[in-house]
Amino acid sequence: MQPIIGGDGYDTPLLLSVGGKGANDVYFSTHAYMAADSTKPIQAFIKAYNAANKTDPENAFAALGYDTVALIADAITRAGSDDPAKVKDALAATKGFAGITGTISFRPGVRVPDKTATIIGVKDEKLFLAAQVTPSFVPAP
């Protein structure tokens, strides 16, 4: 069987529940590996999310949203103000922000962050962490 490659839209429980054996050899990029055997920050996030919501996060978008709020809070702190222009400058100067989904940095003049991407695979109808990479090139949106 040929592998199937997809994007973060594949990051849904439906991939396994609907796909069954047909989901084997699927690989997709997403923002974090949301499993019990993931990183300690992700495990802690899943535990806190479950405590607050009585369910696990459906996919990595919850963790990415958490990182987004944390990144903005960090930028406000570094800016010493919530003035939008100062926060924008602080965001643009972000280097090595340790988010739970990976490290986030911005390059001068580029509004798309350098961030870790997670590649998830399916084998025996189970998700596994295939790779984590930081792309050296990200095309403009």
PLM feature spans:
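Extracytosolic ligand-binding ectodomains
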Residues: M1-P141
